[in-house]
């Protein structure tokens, strides 16, 4: 009863604040020089790690510039192990699981539709029974996403037009946020296997930008960025991925870090 009441209140508050005007105003503020004085407060509140960044808070002209900051990728060595799959982002592992036979996957006790998430309507596809990994980027994390494998890739779909919070509260009390939010669906082909990589937008700023125009990517190569903290979902074919021993809910991971192996 209590959880139901909290869920209704949470969704109502989100709907009241999540519309085009508020998104426009927040985005405009973050991109303007007016937001520059907020950077030190933001950095302190979210405990940004400046050791990985060339420069200081004073070098950024706006919050938006800070969100999409570059980092020294020499501090993110890409795993050289054979058949390695690496983390595409700096973030936190929210869930590791397997796509269910009924075409759903479960995150934080909620069932999501694989078809709705990916736009794949066929019930007969190679991802049935495969692993999925959900990685959450908080506002403090580096906001760029990279390729988890060496591959050829294509963008299969651009879905959703609004976004809701993808943090712990959003997953617990929101309504199917991972399969409703604005998102891209990429298919990565390593030559023998396919992997789906799905960057999912976050509330208000709701922006995903692809920076790489090449059709082939090296493992760890940048593909794009978010304009605010968000989520990346990886989906593997059945019997095509073996998670590493440390890949567990709540684990912090970094770009280039080993998260498993292609099989």
UniProtKB/Swiss-Prot annotation:
Pfam families cross-referenced by the UniProt entry: PS_Dcarbxylase
GO molecular function: phosphatidylserine decarboxylase activity
Reaction(s) catalysed by this chain's protein: a 1,2-diacyl-sn-glycero-3-phospho-L-serine + H(+) = a 1,2-diacyl-sn-glycero-3-phosphoethanolamine + CO2
Cofactor(s) named in the record: pyruvate
EC annotation from Swiss-Prot or TrEMBL: 4.1.1.65
Enzyme class: lyase
InterPro entries cross-referenced by the UniProt entry: PS_Dcarbxylase (IPR003817), PSD-B (IPR033177), PSD_type1_pro (IPR033178)
Membrane topology: Peripheral membrane protein
Cellular location(s): Cell membrane
Site positions (Cleavage (non-hydrolytic)): 229-230
Listed GO CC annotations: plasma membrane
Keyword set, alphabetical order: Cell membrane, Decarboxylase, Lipid biosynthesis, Lipid metabolism, Lyase, Membrane, Phospholipid biosynthesis, Phospholipid metabolism, Pyruvate, Zymogen
GO biological process terms held by the UniProt record: phosphatidylethanolamine biosynthetic process
Catalytic residues (UniProt): 90, 146, 230
The record's account of how the chain is modified after translation: Is synthesized initially as an inactive proenzyme. Formation of the active enzyme involves a self-maturation process in which the active site pyruvoyl group is generated from an internal serine residue via an autocatalytic post-translational modification. Two non-identical subunits are generated from the proenzyme in this reaction, and the pyruvate is formed at the N-terminus of the alpha chain, which is derived from the carboxyl end of the proenzyme.
Metabolic or biological pathway: Phospholipid metabolism; phosphatidylethanolamine biosynthesis; phosphatidylethanolamine from CDP-diacylglycerol: step 2/2
Cofactor note: Binds 1 pyruvoyl group covalently per subunit.
Observed phenotype of the null mutant: Disruption mutant contains no phosphatidylethanolamine and accumulates phosphatidylserine, but it grows well without supplementation of divalent cations.
Residue positions where Pyruvic acid (Ser) is found in the record: 230
Family note: Belongs to the phosphatidylserine decarboxylase family. PSD-B subfamily. Prokaryotic type I sub-subfamily.
UniProt subunit comment: Heterodimer of a large membrane-associated beta subunit and a small pyruvoyl-containing alpha subunit.
Function: Catalyzes the formation of phosphatidylethanolamine (PtdEtn) from phosphatidylserine (PtdSer).
HAMAP family: PS_decarb_PSD_B_type1
Protein name, UniProt field: Phosphatidylserine decarboxylase proenzyme
Organism: Bacillus subtilis (strain 168)
Designated gene of the protein: psd
